Amino acid sequence: MRVCSFCHEEIEPGTGKMYVKRDGTIYFFCSSKCEKNMIKLGRVPRKVKWVKK
């Protein structure tokens, strides 16, 4: 199973989204909420309260 790059929640096979940056870095996201917070808004997961510790 894959793990979300933002909230570290397990992602079921066949769900979620894989995001590849131009430099080759691969991110996996469980939801659009996680994707937007990391990519678009540039938030750091450890500073967001709803992310698992």
Curated annotation (Swiss-Prot):
Q: Which SUPFAM superfamilies match?
A: Glucocorticoid receptor-like (DNA-binding domain) (SSF57716)
**Which cofactors, if any, are listed as required?**
Zn(2+)
Sequence positions that bind Zn(2+): 4, 7, 30, 34
Superkingdom per UniProt = Archaea
- Per the record's keyword annotation, is Zinc-finger included, yes or no? yes
> rRNA-binding: is it a keyword of this entry?
yes
A Gene Ontology BP annotation from the UniProt entry: translation
Q: Name the GO cellular-component terms.
A: ribonucleoprotein complex; ribosome
Return the NCBIfam families for the record. PRK14891.1-1
Q: What does this protein do?
A: Binds to the 23S rRNA.
What's the family?
A: Belongs to the eukaryotic ribosomal protein eL24 family.
Q: What is this protein called?
A: Large ribosomal subunit protein eL24
Q: What is the lineage of its organism?
A: Archaea, Methanobacteriati, Methanobacteriota, Methanomada group, Methanobacteria
What gene makes this protein?
rpl24e
